Amino acid sequence: MAEEGISAGGVMDVNTALQEVLKTALIHDGLARGIREAAKALDKRQAHLCVLASNCDEPMYVKLVEALCAEPQINLIKVDDNKKLGEWVGLCKIDREGKPRKVVGCSCVVVKDYGKESQAKDVIEEYFKIKK
């Protein structure tokens, strides 16, 4: 789980860093969203990072993604809600006030390209170094 309380570097927590990394990767067309795209990217070993929703209702999806991440040792991070993950990766409409509407749940996202170097990317990498 991406703990709210852990702050690598003392500036940004892991969830905030994850949102930044996903947003940057989305802008640079470096995301594979959904189980099919994610499985393809993981199988081809194009992935740098995999994000899986903990509330995924299909246990076989979870097993597949965990297995595909385990063999080549791709970093896997779990978030608690698929709707939140869907919002973070742009699977929603934004209304006039800037609030997300019609959010589509997303159970799995793979970052194929970070886009650019950032503090958020460093925080995520530091999180996995500490975790290992």
From Swiss-Prot:
Keywords: Cytoplasm, Ribonucleoprotein, Ribosomal protein. Pfam families: Ribosomal_L7Ae. The gene is rps12. Its main location: cytoplasm. The keyword Ribosomal protein applies. This is Small ribosomal subunit protein eS12. Belongs to the eukaryotic ribosomal protein eS12 family. The keyword Metal-binding does not apply. Gene3D superfamilies: 3.30.1330.30. It is found in: Cytoplasm. GO terms for biological process: maintenance of translational fidelity; ribosomal small subunit biogenesis.
